[in-house]
Each structure stands twice: as C-alpha cells, then as structure tokens.
Amino acid sequence: MSNDPGNEVSSLYPPPPPYVKFFTQSNLEKLPKYKEKKAASAKQTAPNNSNGGSEEEITCALDYLIPPPMPKNQQYRAFGSIWQVKDQLPDLESMGLTQLYKKSTENESTNYQYKIQELRKLLKSLLLNYLELIGVLSINPDMYERKVENIRTILVNIHHLLNEYRPHQSRESLIMLLEEQLEYKRGEIREIEQVCKQVHDKLTSIQDTLRTGSQSPPSSSQ
C-alpha cells in the first residue's frame, strides 16, 4: 500500500491527525485559564499591533484544543475535497451549461408546482429528441452527435431541476413520517384505552358477583 500523504488525506478513513496527542486530561484542565489569558493578551496587543508569537510558541499545544473560527472564504477542505460553507446549489449558467427552464422568481422559489410543470416540459422535450434521434440514425447516422448533445443538455437540466425539488421532497417525506408516527401512537392509545375498559368491566363484574354473594341469605339447616 502506498505511503503517499495525498492518499491518506483522500482515503475513506484517514489516520488521526498528529495533534490528537495534545488532547490530554492535563491540557483540558489548563484550557480555561489559557483561554482567559489569551483573550486578555489579544486585547492588549490589538491597539499597538505587537507580535505575541513567543508566548504562543510556548503554549501552542493548547491552541489545538480551541475550535478554529469559521473560514473567511466560504470554503473548507475535508477528506481531500473542497466544500462550501453554505450548502447552495449553483445554477447551470455559472457552471457553463445551458439552462432550458425558466428561472424561478421570488414567489416561485417556494412554489414547487412550477418545477413540476417545467419537469413535464423537459420530459416531453426528451421524448421528442429521442424520436428525432431515431429518425436521424435511420436516415443519416453520421449526424447523430447534435441530437445526442441535445439529449444530454435536457438530462442535465432535469437532474438539476430535481435537485432543486429535493428540499420540498425532504419536507414532505418528513411530514409523512411524522403523520405515520402520530397515527401509530394514536392506535396504541386506542388499544390501551380498550384494554383498560375491558379490565374495568371485568373488575366491575367481579365486584357485582361478590356483592350479590354477600347479600344472599344463608340457607336454613334442617
């Protein structure tokens, strides 16, 4: 197996980082005082813009225990890949692709019915281009590239539009799951109430039987 550091970064389960050795119980006990000292030092060094590197070099091990700030460039690297801080789906034009469906307005961005209509239009266009591709292949097979590219563009637009629809799909799936759980809990409550009623009726029947037996006159002996 290769010992290339790049392979370790992009592997599924990379080894722990080297600074994990600083996460000791002793350092955790020193961390609160170090944070206070570092904050006070930052206030003192901020006006004159002095360099406090010497102190940080002495206690640099405790810096690894402090969570890093949010990245300023809206990107971060994890497992060898670059991720966006804000999970936002880029539009097709920014990726250099042709967008066939119309852009959603502010009112349409939350109205997912228009996305369903656009999906139906794209599906019809896909079927039409597929039939045209079959016709081109039967007449002049060398002219298939343009139709294949059109089909590819339509499929990319369908896939992108489906990704825009996923937030609504997730909410609806969550609503359905909660409704199923609610109905299941209601069914359990109904069954518990039914069993409680049966137990209550049984106890009432036993009490009536005992009461009737105690009130009956004793039989006279001959």
UniProtKB/Swiss-Prot annotation:
Disordered: annotated span: 34-55
Organism domain of life: Eukaryota
The keyword Transcription regulation belongs to this UniProt entry's keyword annotation: yes
This protein's GO CC annotations: core mediator complex; mediator complex; nucleus
Stretches with biased composition (Polar residues): 42-53
Cell compartment(s), UniProt: Nucleus
Main location: nucleus
Protein family per UniProt: Belongs to the Mediator complex subunit 7 family.
Note: Present with 7598 molecules/cell in log phase SD medium.
Subunit (UniProt): Component of the Mediator complex, which is composed of at least 21 subunits that form three structurally distinct submodules. The Mediator head module contains MED6, MED8, MED11, SRB4/MED17, SRB5/MED18, ROX3/MED19, SRB2/MED20 and SRB6/MED22, the middle module contains MED1, MED4, NUT1/MED5, MED7, CSE2/MED9, NUT2/MED10, SRB7/MED21 and SOH1/MED31, and the tail module contains MED2, PGD1/MED3, RGR1/MED14, GAL11/MED15 and SIN4/MED16. The head and the middle modules interact directly with RNA polymerase II, whereas the elongated tail module interacts with gene-specific regulatory proteins.
Protein name in UniProt: Mediator of RNA polymerase II transcription subunit 7
Organism: Saccharomyces cerevisiae (strain ATCC 204508 / S288c)
The gene coding this protein: MED7
